[in-house]
């Protein structure tokens, strides 16, 4: 017999099924400190094994933005959870902290257990990549708020650091080298503009195969998951090799780089020092976007940029052979970010 909640559009039984389906995915993410209490009123994590003199918890929260619309249109939900985790844990590790645990929030018009499982499986995969435990979350069915197929996902990450080892603007010095870590593509920013350029202005289809993106289709390129930098950065952080880190997300170089150094400094960027990924060249071409604006919106092929003292550059490059030396920190005159070579 249909109950009152079902008549209002909320499928309670589907919600119960979701809880059963996602248990196995969260269990894969367990790490030291996990108490295995998924399903309680709050997620619990034991910090007693982390022997720090002045422990500091560092938290981050984010979503995936309108990249979700592509996932919904393409009915490909398996990797969007990786994006959600990446956006949060990359912010946490950029502060100098080791991610410990993660919680997700999923709001939908209609709960489809298989779809929710696919999304949460992606979250769990991202957590495994970041070595962060998935200790809780919320799935909210809101038929009056969302269309039947629509959903939104957000995440919350918490990490830990010794207070003296936090990456703060005061750590970054004049003469420090800027080391860029390659991105996997657009990551999770700029999709409102990108969708407008490719699908509205130029009527591309997600199945289109552009030579510059081969062997991927346009849709596959745009749904490539955001790269998670935790495994690359933690050894450097523990060895004291990094003065600062900037996660290049919304706002690109111009907004995010200045967040890691003081107002007395500027980032001098050598533009020809790394390969700009083909997807960005296509966006600039078809969107007729001025070069400087591209660096104000997108990561341009570098998802994380580190400030490293001259004496540590060689060691960092040894540990991160795929990274690029892209510039230096110099005294600021006017602009916080200076591009060498004409844009």
Swiss-Prot record:
One of its GO terms (biological process) is 'de novo' IMP biosynthetic process. Belongs to the AIR synthase family. Its EC number is 6.3.3.1. It is an enzyme of class 6 (ligase). It comes from the Bacteria. GO terms for cellular component: cytosol. It is found in: Cytoplasm. Keywords: ATP-binding, Cytoplasm, Ligase, Nucleotide-binding, Purine biosynthesis. One of its GO terms (molecular function) is phosphoribosylamine-glycine ligase activity. Pathway: Purine metabolism; IMP biosynthesis via de novo pathway; 5-amino-1-(5-phospho-D-ribosyl)imidazole from N(2)-formyl-N(1)-(5-phospho-D-ribosyl)glycinamide: step 2/2. Its main location: cytoplasm. It catalyses: 2-formamido-N(1)-(5-O-phospho-beta-D-ribosyl)acetamidine + ATP = 5-amino-1-(5-phospho-beta-D-ribosyl)imidazole + ADP + phosphate + H(+). This is Phosphoribosylformylglycinamidine cyclo-ligase.
């Amino acid at each position: 017999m249909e109950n009152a909640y079902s008549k209002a559009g909320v499928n309670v039984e589907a919600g119960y099924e979701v809880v059963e389906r996602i248990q196995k995915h969260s269990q894969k993410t367990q790490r030291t400190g996990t108490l295995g209490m998924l399903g309680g009123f709050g997620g619990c994590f034991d910090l007693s094994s982390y022997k720090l003199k002045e422990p500091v918890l560092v938290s981050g929260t984010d979503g995936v933005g309108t990249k979700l619309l592509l996932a919904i249109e393409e009915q490909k939900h398996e990797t969007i959870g990786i994006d959600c985790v990446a956006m949060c844990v990359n912010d946490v590790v950029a502060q100098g902290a080791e991610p410990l645990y993660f919680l997700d929030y999923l709001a939908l018009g209609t709960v489809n257990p298989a779809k929710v499982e696919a999304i949460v499986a992606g979250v769990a995969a991202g957590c495994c990549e970041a070595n962060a435990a998935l200790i809780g979350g919320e799935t909210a069915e809101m038929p009056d708020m969302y269309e039947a197929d629509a959903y939104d996902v957000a995440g919350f990450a918490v990490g830990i650091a010794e207070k003296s080892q936090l990456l703060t603007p005061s750590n970054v010095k004049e003469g420090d080298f800027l080391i860029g870590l390659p991105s996997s593509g657009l990551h999770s920013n700029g999709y409102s503009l990108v969708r407008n350029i490719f699908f509205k202005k130029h009527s591309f289809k997600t199945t289109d195969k552009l030579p510059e993106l081969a062997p991927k289709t346009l849709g596959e390129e745009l749904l490539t998951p955001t790269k998670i930098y935790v495994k690359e950065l933690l050894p450097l952080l523990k060895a004291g090799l990094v003065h600062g880190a900037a996660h290049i997300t919304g706002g690109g170089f111009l907004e995010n780089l200045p967040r890691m150094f003081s107002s007395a400094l500027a980032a001098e960027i050598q533009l020809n020092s790394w390969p700009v990924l083909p997807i960005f060249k296509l966006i600039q071409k078809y969107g007729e976007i001025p070069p400087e604006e591209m660096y104000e919106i997108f990561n341009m092929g570098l998802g994380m940029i580190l400030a490293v003292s001259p004496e540590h550059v060689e060691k960092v490059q040894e540990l991160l052979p795929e990274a690029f030396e892209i510039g230096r920190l110099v005294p600021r005159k006017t602009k916080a970010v200076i591009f060498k070579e004409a844009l």
